[in-house]
Swiss-Prot record:
The complex is composed of two ATP-binding proteins (HmuV), two transmembrane proteins (HmuU) and a solute-binding protein (HmuT). This is Hemin import ATP-binding protein HmuV. Belongs to the ABC transporter superfamily. Heme (hemin) importer (TC 3.A.1.14.5) family. Keywords: ATP-binding, Cell inner membrane, Cell membrane, Membrane, Nucleotide-binding, Translocase, Transport. It is found in: Cell inner membrane. One of its GO terms (molecular function) is ATP hydrolysis activity. PROSITE patterns: ABC_TRANSPORTER_2, HMUV. The lineage of its organism: Bacteria, Pseudomonadati, Pseudomonadota, Alphaproteobacteria, Hyphomicrobiales. Pfam families: ABC_tran. InterPro entries: AAA+_ATPase, ABC_transporter-like_ATP-bd, P-loop_NTPase. One of its GO terms (cellular component) is plasma membrane. It is a peripheral membrane protein. It comes from the Bacteria.
Length: 261
């Protein structure tokens, strides 16, 4: 089976400042991958390269054995969907109108997918609300529904796609964080490749198949949660002492102990 996505020595720099350096990566169809690391580690820049939002200044990123730079914007939008870290809407669109922006097929065909997206993020009661009146978490869920609709409409034409999420749980309460993680897990089981930036190491360890750990622009670790969530590695990358235990499923979880002086 061909890889869903590959990066070969992919780097990105602005002038003489390297933001991401020589990342090599192979992502299989249906994998759920979490990208973790401290602020400024290069996580969002890496995700933007993997999505095609920016081109590597060196190396290459390929999706389905084809360089991302060769896709037209329309074809790229049909094959991958991206939830940005910040999406500000300054106009009084309704929740329905925002979500429908993700559809690229006939509305009659997309209607069941639209209804499913609204249900998945628990926004049935908010369909007609002005999005500018919603809380930050409600707005984030609205945009997640839009991205899901885009993904599913694209998959109707192209088959299993790619879902990229930049800090998708940043404004969500614990219930909706778990809802989103479960939804990402279901997408992966259906064949979608999911890559998400997460700051919650425990959420990453519980739901991800693999964890990529970024540090100072480099891919420092790539492996299973048990292989990456280790006290020595966490201390080196995050500069904090952490105790690693196991939950009832065997997944590692961390407890802050004492920051290094």
């Amino acid at each position: 089976m061909s890889a869903a996505l590959t990066a070969n020595a992919a780097s990105f720099a602005i002038g003489s400042v390297a933001l991401v350096e020589r990342v090599d990566l192979r992502v299989e169809p249906g994998e759920l991958i979490a990208i973790v690391g401290p602020n400024g580690a290069g996580k969002s820049t890496l995700l933007r390269m993997l999505s095609g939002d920016v081109r590597p200044t060196a190396g290459a990123v390929r999706m389905a054995n084809r360089d991302l730079s060769t896709y037209s914007p329309r074809e790229l939008a049909g094959r991958r969907a991206v939830l940005a870290q910040h999406t500000n809407v300054g106009f009084p669109f309704s929740v329905e109108e925002i979500v429908w922006m993700g559809a690229d097929i006939d509305r009659r065909k997309a209607a069941p997918l639209f209804d499913r997206a609204i249900r998945e993020v628990r926004l049935e009661a908010f369909r007609h609300r002005d999005v500018t009146t919603l809380s930050g978490g409600e707005q984030q869920r609205t945009h997640f529904a839009r991205v899901l609709l885009q993904l599913w409409c694209g998959e109707a034409s192209y088959g299993p796609g790619l879902l990229l999420l930049d800090e998708p749980t940043s404004s969500l309460d614990i219930r909706h964080q778990l809802d989103l993680a479960e939804m990402a897990r279901r997408c992966a089981r259906d064949g979608t490749t999911v890559i998400a930036i997460l700051h919650d190491l425990n959420l990453a360890a519980r739901f991800a198949d693999r964890i990529l750990m970024m540090h100072q622009g480099a891919l420092t670790a790539d492996g299973t949660p048990s292989a990456v969530i280790r006290p020595d590695l966490l201390a080196r990358v995050f500069d904090v002492d952490l105790s690693v235990s196991r939950d009832s499923t065997g997944a590692p979880f961390v407890l802050p102990q004492l920051a290094k002086r």
